[in-house]
């Protein structure tokens, strides 16, 4: 999952996944200038916690650190450290289910204990039978919440962040795991509703409020147009990721992908055409909503920064996905130079 820090997304042609047809109108993000500092801090922390001890896990760690650097390109050093730790936790927690690292009862235990932390900010009591990996992830999560309290403009912002973690877990990670256990693929609309949340975009946007030291009111964050833009960011990341990860998931015999669901009634090329059109349509809707807000009485610098944060998270995921070795897209395409 490692990425070269100086590699940006390129324009590709004749790619079997047609990624050059996914159009985003925003400026590509570049790695945060504090990347090296944050990487050193994260490596020390994970070593202290006993995480990422084998090469595969270290490669994954380095890849996620770079991803966060693309997602939060203008964050200060401590703010980027906080955002990076949270994105790492999302990947670690997803791997509990996705790669079946724990027994079923251990997965349930990790889930229940994490939910307790989301709701209280405190870890439940430990016992001798607790899997050490669960303890490690809890320690990481508690450090993340401690940083959130230190960096957030107000306790309301911290509470909103913790609530987004709970929603990610309850409405995203757990239902997605239930889908993986099914013998048949879910309906496309059911999959999208869960995948949008499981992709973690809304949680990363809530994290951005802390990273950027914003202090938006609930009325602004919950304004229907703003909510829809946040949802679009999640949909765009989820469906684009399903395209980027398609061949990797085939190699791992993972059929839980929107393209596979579409292919139940469409050819692969038609499924890809439909999905790319939907992605580009969502971006057009996002831009229309942004223009509507810019012309409204709600428009002010903090809201503009909030929306720019959404754009950076989406664009950062695109740039990283097209340049990282996790999906190894370069091996499947002809590069335009």
Swiss-Prot record:
UniProt cross-references to Pfam families, sorted A to Z: Terpene_syn_C_2
Motif (NSE motif): 241-249
Motif D(D/E)XX(D/E) motif mapped to chain: 94-98
Binding site for Mg(2+) 1: 94, 98
Annotated residues for binding of Mg(2+) 3: 241, 245, 249
Binding, substrate: 195
Catalysed reaction equations from the record: (2E,6E)-farnesyl diphosphate = alpha-muurolene + diphosphate; (2E,6E)-farnesyl diphosphate = (-)-(E)-beta-caryophyllene + diphosphate
Protein name: Terpene synthase 4
